[in-house]
Each structure stands twice: as structure tokens, then as C-alpha cells.
């Protein structure tokens, strides 16, 4: 998508001040065929709840393990030690 937006700019820089030689309209080769007709809609892969769970749950577990290890490291090296004085809700 970025290349299709840069294509007219590059052509204009190469050709200089001769904009009548180049079309500065958008180039959408992913939507239209060379003859100008619309391409058929691409096949959609179903994204089921099982795939979602198999993707999200391991990420959450890995993130929790990393956070736990970092918290233990900080507490062991006395970089951050939670104090009981912060729990004053009265």
C-alpha cells in the first residue's frame, strides 16, 4: 500500500515538471484486474474461538511468568520492596 502511494511521487520526481506524461491517480492493482474489472473477493479463513483461545492464553501465561520473574528479581536485589505502609485504606 505504501509503494502504491509512493509510485506517483517517484514518477513525478523522475519526470520533473512534466505531469501530463504521468497519471497521478491511485494505483490499486490488488482490487482491479488489468482490464479494469473488479477481482473476486479473496477466500476468508474462519477465525474460530478455539484459534483465539490457543493464541491468547499462551501469550497471557508467558507474560505473567515474565512479570513474576522480574518482580522476584527486583525484590531480591532490594530495588523495589513493597512496604506494608502503603496498604492504609482507613
From Swiss-Prot:
InterPro entries: MCU_reg
Annotated Pfam families: DDDD
Lipid bilayer topology: Single-pass membrane protein
The UniProt record lists the keyword Ribonucleoprotein: no
Compartment(s) of residence: Mitochondrion inner membrane
Any one GO BP annotation for this protein: calcium import into the mitochondrion
Mitochondrial intermembrane side: 77-90
Record's GO cellular component terms: uniplex complex
Residue intervals passing through the bilayer: 49-76
PANTHER family in UniProt: ESSENTIAL MCU REGULATOR, MITOCHONDRIAL
Role according to the record: Essential regulatory subunit of the mitochondrial calcium uniporter complex (uniplex), a complex that mediates calcium uptake into mitochondria. Required to bridge the calcium-sensing proteins MICU1 with the calcium-conducting subunit MCU. Acts by mediating activation of MCU and retention of MICU1 to the MCU pore, in order to ensure tight regulation of the uniplex complex and appropriate responses to intracellular calcium signaling.
Complex formation: Component of the uniplex complex, composed of MCU, EMRE, MICU1 and MICU2 in a 4:4:1:1 stoichiometry.
Family: Belongs to the SMDT1/EMRE family.
The protein's name: Essential MCU regulator, mitochondrial
Organism, as annotated: Tribolium castaneum
Amino acid at each position: 500500500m505504501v509503494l502504491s502511494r509512493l509510485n506517483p511521487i517517484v514518477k513525478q520526481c523522475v519526470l520533473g515538471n512534466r505531469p501530463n506524461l504521468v497519471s497521478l491517480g491511485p494505483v490499486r492493482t490488488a482490487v482491479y484486474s488489468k482490464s479494469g474489472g473488479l477481482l473476486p473477493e479473496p477466500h476468508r479463513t474462519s477465525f474460530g474461538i478455539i484459534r483465539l483461545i490457543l493464541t491468547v492464553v499462551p501469550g497471557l501465561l508467558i507474560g505473567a511468568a515474565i512479570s513474576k520473574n522480574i518482580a522476584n528479581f527486583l525484590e531480591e536485589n532490594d530495588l523495589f520492596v513493597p512496604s506494608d505502609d502503603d496498604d492504609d485504606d482507613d
